[in-house]
Amino acid sequence: MVLQQQTHFLTKKIDQEDEEEEPSHDFIFRSKLPDIFIPNHLPLTDYVFQRFSGDGDGDSSTTCIIDGATGRILTYADVQTNMRRIAAGIHRLGIRHGDVVMLLLPNSPEFALSFLAVAYLGAVSTTANPFYTQPEIAKQAKASAAKMIITKKCLVDKLTNLKNDGVLIVCLDDDGDNGVVSSSDDGCVSFTELTQADETELLKPKISPEDTVAMPYSSGTTGLPKGVMITHKGLVTSIAQKVDGENPNLNFTANDVILCFLPMFHIYALDALMLSAMRTGAALLIVPRFELNLVMELIQRYKVTVVPVAPPVVLAFIKSPETERYDLSSVRIMLSGAATLKKELEDAVRLKFPNAIFGQGYGMTESGTVAKSLAFAKNPFKTKSGACGTVIRNAEMKVVDTETGISLPRNKSGEICVRGHQLMKGYLNDPEATARTIDKDGWLHTGDIGFVDDDDEIFIVDRLKELIKFKGYQVAPAELEALLISHPSIDDAAVVAMKDEVADEVPVAFVARSQGSQLTEDDVKSYVNKQVVHYKRIKMVFFIEVIPKAVSGKILRKDLRAKLETMCSK
């Protein structure tokens, strides 16, 4: 009996010790900056232009938008007047609160004005790539139930079927003196009808913070593109997390000229550039597309202070000898986002912009901004090369084990999860995909693998589904790509998995050689394989002209895997 009691006591004690060893709470990471008050009860346009109303300190006569293509300038007063007129014009055509308007436009002042007008009306903008094919446009327009499409004259032929189905087409052309002329296309409404509408005809709509304001399309962590419902509250929160407060994480000021050649239909340019610039009273220099010499000429002419980039753009700056011909000394911030920038590229671009603070940010369409370098803060922190920043203020982040879901401490890699008011409301008409992405506790699972170091800085290792499994070992493509790009005869590279009967998967490389290079497969394999452990060695190399990438700069690995499958089946 005594022995049984002792055994019971020892067993109970061991169980208690085991319970004490298990983590009793999540490892949750927050910003080094204190949380701030965010007025996310306001409609988006009220918030963005708050400094120009009431007791605000903004000067409406200052420059808001510079059209890089024509030199046309719009002041903050011009932008707000046009916003209200276009909203009234859209309303006159039958668009109401909650209706969806597709913006099928390249970077232009009209894109910005249209987005703001739709938001002011309480309607929803779904943004689309103007280079989409007719079927791609139709698929998004129908899935989003768009009632109107605002586009350019040269794109109208892609919209014939939609026009026949009753979708209103508003058309602009940028060949006129003022940047917009009437369309002569039958069945299309001229954009000038909107800009000349009587704003007094529209009573300001009542907008809830939970109303959807933007609906870009994203594949998320997997699957087909889905409509991402971003609310007024979510977008206001995402902007404020970056640029509001006494010590903003991203210190844009009214004296800045912010360059925008990254596509405005993508959330990065829309949120972190266009709307953040307007919130702070800065000037936004809009360029239709990235052309290296034109961009450098505009930097010199307008004394641009902020240049946001993506990895392909950084590569262009690094590899071009033309950079020496231009005065780029006005640039004080170079912000890399949309895709993780390798340390080798970061170090190289610093030499081209000697006066610029360089750092990275990290986010996704569904989550808003997740992290931002504190090197950009008004009172900056020391940061490490290669880090994508620290978690944004007024938000929480954790790193979870991909197998168990248990949260991990510092310096342990796992899936990055984020929680906060900046998150999307969900995917349009897809509750299952929403539930897979945002769990019951409100954590959005990004599908990105990373870790938080001892200084709260975040490092992205790879994408969850992009990891290569070699006999159970994890191989990160990003690591091998960094090595490949460091070779002087390689312009760009991507690594994907190839099926293998013995190892399950092996890494293979697609390589874009420098012009005139005679680099061979053996040269590439030798260069990489001598620098990595055996299971990370490149097994095959395929030479191609260009690495396929999305407009965001992310490698289109699905395309490369399909190409690999075709080549291996021959």
From Swiss-Prot:
Span list, region SBD2: 361-427
EC number(s) stated in the UniProt entry for this protein: 6.2.1.12, 6.2.1.34, 6.2.1.-
Disulphide bonds in the chain: none
GO BP terms in the entry: phenylpropanoid biosynthetic process
PROSITE patterns given in the database record: AMP_BINDING
Record: residues binding ATP: 218-222, 226, 360-361, 365, 448, 463, 554
InterPro entries in the record: AMP-bd_C, AMP-bd_C_sf, AMP-binding_CS, AMP-dep_synth/lig_dom, ANL_N_sf
Amino-acid positions noted as binding (E)-4-coumaroyl-AMP in the UniProt annotation, renumbered to this chain: 268, 338, 360-361, 365, 465, 469
Additional remark text: Activates efficiently sinapate, besides the usual 4CL substrates (4-coumarate, caffeate, and ferulate).
Function according to Swiss-Prot or TrEMBL: Produces CoA thioesters of a variety of hydroxy- and methoxy-substituted cinnamic acids, which are used to synthesize several phenylpropanoid-derived compounds, including anthocyanins, flavonoids, isoflavonoids, coumarins, lignin, suberin and wall-bound phenolics. Follows a two-step reaction mechanism, wherein the carboxylate substrate first undergoes adenylation by ATP, followed by a thioesterification in the presence of CoA to yield the final CoA thioesters.
Protein name in UniProt: 4-coumarate--CoA ligase 4
